[in-house]
Amino acid sequence: MMKAPRGTQDLLPGTVETWQYVEEKLRDMSARYNYKEIRTPIFETTNLFTRSVGETTDIVQKEMFTLVKKGKDEYTLRPEGTASVVRAFVTNKLFGNPDQPTKLYYMGPMFRYERPQKGRFRQLHQYGVEAIGSSDPAVDAEVISLAYSIYKSFGLQKIKVVVNSLGDAESRNAHRDALIRHFEPVAGELCQDCQSRLYKNPLRILDCKVDRDHPSMKTAPSILEYLNEESKAYFEQVLAQLDALGVAYEVDPTLVRGLDYYTHTAFEIMSEAEGFGAITTLCGGGRYNGLVQDIGGPDMPGIGFGIGLERLILALENEGVLPELETGLDVFIVAQGEKEVELTATRLLQLLRMEGFKADRDYQGRKFKGQFKQADRLKAKFTVILGDDEVERGAAALKDMTTGEQVDVPLSAVADKIRELSEGAGQ
């Protein structure tokens, strides 16, 4: 029997409605903050990700799905959304718009070759925002506030916001040198990945899952000790803006993001709920002031974040805040009789759909009893009953499936009667 590829899942009716609910709320929150949707290809040139995400990152070294090469260009399924959005920003010259920052959001599948586990897939789905074109600390705070507000809008309570500053280039270089001096004496005790990163990108050592309990991690120099005055002032303004927005946060100097393009502000939103699992990060993001220029555009700053939808839904389930979703039909037509009954059912079904009702009928030739059972399974609020007698009289029996009450209605008035009864019952 054929199965879905490892690390993927089929979203079936009964489950996909939850996804639609989540996606609709995300679109609503995006609109409140004036973010417009952008849709980019699911594959890009491999070079885009090696240049932007970073050659020493786990994503580039271990997790990318690169397509079999045909022709001169090599393509990779997108492992994250920011690089593609920034590429589209440059390609389509959105930097020429008079109103900056350009505020964009995206939603769609990403692909990473990693070990599947609870809430983590090889085809994952991500929502994210990018605000490109402003270096105002208030934009950093707004982006963090949007992410925080999204989780609160779903009713999640057991979350926390963690922030850090990675500083500007001068600050990062000073911190980089300090990290090399710190880890050099114990390099032989670290994993192979950390050893290879020591001189290329020592900041990534702090994000290592293998060596996170090594004593040297606890005593590693903090980036906050190496921020120059400009970076320190910028971070203080971000925190002041967060205070003004009412966003509670913790400053964690050990927080680094797994992508190389981050500068200044970095943040994560984490779950503190029991039973959520070992991976508690729900959302991550930060500022990337050099990325637009690296991809071939002008020197313009940006900031954004990404939310994994699988992990968001897992958090909603874990805290028990998913609402009961309306998935049933408005009306089901129960019809049995001669040919004219069938044709009348077909005409009435189309009329009801054009009137805006979610409607269906039996296509298996079931008897009345079987059709009523089908209406129950489909959670129909009303059934319209048609037989030879009803059609001959130009009428139908309309049954409220909640109360069991049944009335005769002229065929021409069925839609209006359903609407009247629905409004009266508050359905």
Curated annotation (Swiss-Prot):
One of its GO terms (cellular component) is cytoplasm. Keywords: Aminoacyl-tRNA synthetase, ATP-binding, Cytoplasm, Ligase, Nucleotide-binding, Protein biosynthesis. HAMAP family: His_tRNA_synth. One of its GO terms (biological process) is histidyl-tRNA aminoacylation. This is Histidine--tRNA ligase. One of its GO terms (molecular function) is catalytic activity, acting on a protein. It is found in: Cytoplasm. The keyword Aminoacyl-tRNA synthetase applies. NCBIfam families: hisS (TIGR00442). It comes from Exiguobacterium sp. (strain ATCC BAA-1283 / AT1b). Its main location: cytoplasm. PROSITE patterns: AA_TRNA_LIGASE_II (PS50862). It comes from the Bacteria. Belongs to the class-II aminoacyl-tRNA synthetase family.
